[in-house]
């Protein structure tokens, strides 16, 4: 595709995140995880890092809170139209869910740095003609529905995301999983690499943000088997993701060469929660230019030239 031409020429790092916050009109974020993902993308563009990001289109958003006349809080869909901001790709791929072929298409949005670089973001969409009605809704809501809905989304993000990058022609040398939602990408990579875990580990990086056990996705193998159905795949998930239930974080950690938490303290808590894994600490940051008001930008421009390239000058 013409709008991806420059990105396809480079060896890319693929950054997978269930939510990404890029602009308020594109409601594919719920909170901090999406905000941080957006800032990673912005910083990568500033530094001209060859990154491509993958997420779900979530065209009905997370939810929008409204107070009714009685003062009660109510939630409503936060719908947006991808065609206003993005380009629809011609390529389609398929994933198996309950032994059905579910077709995926992709929208592309390119974030352009105020300096020089850019990062393409791939938004996966199951609202494709020919899919069953329930399958067309998989990418409607961010974190919507129950465990079944969530696991379907994670199949689309992880397995479908890898397949879409291949279909679009990206040459990926590293896969970065931002939380366990995308961990099923490692299953797809295992199958592409003769089930060799060492080859997959060399390809994968995992970042965990969640300091409590309840925050990590876990799925009963009855549900996993019902949706994935391939017995060999389910056995792979048991081998690397836990025997009693499928823990997406354990699966990601067992198949990653590098694991990090998001502060020193958080890495210590995560190491205690998941003993036996070396969890490094990379402190969360923000893309300072984005979150600095125009008034302060002018002030910094006057007294701290080039602060947008070296934000530590403002500290």
Stretches with model-predicted labels:
Residues 1-315:
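Catalytic cores of carbohydrate-active enzymes across secretory and cytosolic contexts
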């Amino acid at each position: 595709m013409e709008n991806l031409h420059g990105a396809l020429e480079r060896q890319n790092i693929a950054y997978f995140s269930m939510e990404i916050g890029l602009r308020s009109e594109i409601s594919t974020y719920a909170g901090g995880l999406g905000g941080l993902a957006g800032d990673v993308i912005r910083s990568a563009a500033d530094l001209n890092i060859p990154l491509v990001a993958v997420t779900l289109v979530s065209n009905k958003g997370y939810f929008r809170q409204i107070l009714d006349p009685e003062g009660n809080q109510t939630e409503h869909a936060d719908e947006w139209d991808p065609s206003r901001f993005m380009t629809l790709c011609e390529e389609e791929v398929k994933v198996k869910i309950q032994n059905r072929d579910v077709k995926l298409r992709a929208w592309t949005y390119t974030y352009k740095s105020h300096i020089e670089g850019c990062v393409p973001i791939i938004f996966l969409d199951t609202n494709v003609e020919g899919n069953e009605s329930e399958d067309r809704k998989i990418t409607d809501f961010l974190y919507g529905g129950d465990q079944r809905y969530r696991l379907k989304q994670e199949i689309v993000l992880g397995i479908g995301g890898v397949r879409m990058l291949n279909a679009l022609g990206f040459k990926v040398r590293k896969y970065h999983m931002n939380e366990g939602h995308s961990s099923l990408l490692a299953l797809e990579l295992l199958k592409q690499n003769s089930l060799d875990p060492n080859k997959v580990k060399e390809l994968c990086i995992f970042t965990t943000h969640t300091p409590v056990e309840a925050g990590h996705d876990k799925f009963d193998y009855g549900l996993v088997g019902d949706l994935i159905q391939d017995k060999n795949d389910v056995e792979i998930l048991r081998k690397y993701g836990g025997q009693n239930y499928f823990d997406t974080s354990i699966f990601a950690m067992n198949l990653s060469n590098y694991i990090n938490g998001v502060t020193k303290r958080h890495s210590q808590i995560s190491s205690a929660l998941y003993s036996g894994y070396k969890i490094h600490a990379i402190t969360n940051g923000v893309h300072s230019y984005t979150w600095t008001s125009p008034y302060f930008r002018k002030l910094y421009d006057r007294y701290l030239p080039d602060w947008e390239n070296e934000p530590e000058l403002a500290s």
